Curated annotation (Swiss-Prot):
Its cofactor is Mg(2+). GO terms for biological process: defense response; response to hydrogen peroxide. Activated by threonine and tyrosine phosphorylation. Activated in response to hydrogen peroxide. Activation is triggered by MAPKKK17 and MAPKKK18 in a MKK3-dependent manner. It catalyses: L-seryl-[protein] + ATP = O-phospho-L-seryl-[protein] + ADP + H(+); L-threonyl-[protein] + ATP = O-phospho-L-threonyl-[protein] + ADP + H(+). Interacts with MKK3. The modification Phosphothreonine is found at T191, T196. This is Mitogen-activated protein kinase 7. It holds the Pfam family Pkinase. The keyword Phosphoprotein applies. One of its GO terms (molecular function) is MAP kinase activity.
């Protein structure tokens, strides 16, 4: 539970109060009353809380010492920039970013999100049974949120069950945009090492210089397979093993299916693998709806140019009765996430402060 404590240096900042949870100090705005800690990661601690002004339950994520690691600082800045623009039922909403007391020396960042009950990883590993309707509804919402992001030229690049939040009504929201990029960005990010390995598309594993929205579709396929089978479909131990597991399922590729591989060494590796006829997905998931298997087969296509698009996946017969194109308008404008990866800490700090001001216009006025 959350325990009210005195400020560590005895000096209380105006408009703040102090709580301890899981040996972590929360210095938060007085309008928020913490309830209990609900999650912990490399970034810090998340707690559930109530906004006393609106009586709304929210999740507060404390990112501790955000500037200790520049990569983490850039991830946080990227998430702030993206979520300020995004408004969609299937994307997590960032409600507030608390304004620290000191503009030039703050170390911690407090993000306030809408509160969800659990995530898809927890549901998959639980003993709770999942009907075909459950599987279909989760997939539909994931594709719907992704279609919106792709309409804004945003690649998520780190889709996995733990980044899909779910509530008691089975509503699903995509979260964690620290690795997201614009699909029309420069080549610098096109060669980065991204996405949790098990959900990583072949073109990323093969270090291709160019990739697009189809990387997210592959991740969706891996997630959907995991929903159907209650275990990861490609639990690779390292990059080369990951590719071998993929070929064992999708089968050895024709020359025409590996033209997208622009790295000669990577192409030679794929050609060197023992021949595999592949495994039909209906054998892996015999209880699954045949239409679900057909759609999954179209998502888990090795060649990204032949992989089904998000829009076509939503129009697939398995999604019949769920998708209404008119109720899923695109994002109003493309969102730019182009950030100079070599920025120094003071510049990143100032950019974060400016993002925070969008949630605190009164502070901007008082500082004018």
């Amino acid at each position: 539970m959350a325990m009210l404590v005195e400020p560590p240096n005895g000096i209380k900042q105006q408009g703040k109060h102090y709580y301890s949870m899981w040996q972590t100090l929360f210095e938060i705005d007085t309008k928020y009353v913490p309830i209990k800690p609900i999650g912990r990661g490399a970034y810090g601690v998340v707690c559930s809380s109530i906004n006393r002004e609106t009586n709304e339950r929210v999740a507060i994520k404390k990112i501790h010492n955000v500037f200790e690691n520049r990569v983490d600082a850039l991830r946080t800045l990227r998430e702030l920039k993206l979520l300020r623009h995004v408004r969609h039922e299937n994307v997590i909403a960032l409600k507030d970013v608390m304004l620290p007391a000191n503009r030039s020396s703050f170390k911690d960042v407090y993000l306030v999100y809408e509160l969800m009950d659990t995530d898809l990883h927890q549901i998959i590993k639980s003993s709770q049974s999942l009907s075909d309707d459950h599987c279909k509804y989760f997939l539909f919402q994931l594709l719907r949120g992704l279609k919106y992001l792709h309409s804004a030229n945003i690649l998520h690049r780190d889709l996995k069950p733990g980044n899909l939040l779910v509530n008691a009504n089975c509503d699903l929201k995509i979260c964690d945009f620290g690795l997201a990029r614009t699909s029309q960005g420069n080549e610098q990010f096109m060669t980065e090492y991204v996405v949790t390995r098990w959900y990583r598309a072949p073109e990323l594993l093969l270090c291709c210089d160019n990739y697009g929205t189809s990387i997210d579709v592959w991740s969706v396929g891996c997630i959907f397979a995991e929903i159907l089978g209650r275990k990861p479909i490609f639990p690779g131990t390292e990059c080369l093993n990951q590719l071998k597991l993929i070929i064992n399922v999708v089968g050895s590729q024709q020359e025409s299916d590996i033209r997208f591989i622009d790295n000669p060494k990577a192409r030679r590796f794929i050609k060197s693998l023992p021949y595999s006829r592949g495994t039909h997905l209906s054998n892996l998931y015999p209880q699954a709806n045949p239409l679900a298997i057909d759609l999954l087969q179209r998502m888990l296509v090795f060649d990204p140019t032949k992989r089904i698009s998000v829009t076509d996946a939503l129009l697939h017969p398995y999604m019949a009765g769920l998708f209404d194109p008119g109720s899923n308008p695109p994002a109003h404008v493309p969102i730019s996430l182009d950030i100079d990866e070599n920025m120094e800490e003071p510049v990143i700090r100032e950019m974060m402060w400016n993002e925070m001001l969008y949630y605190h216009p009164e502070a901007e006025i008082s500082n004018a």
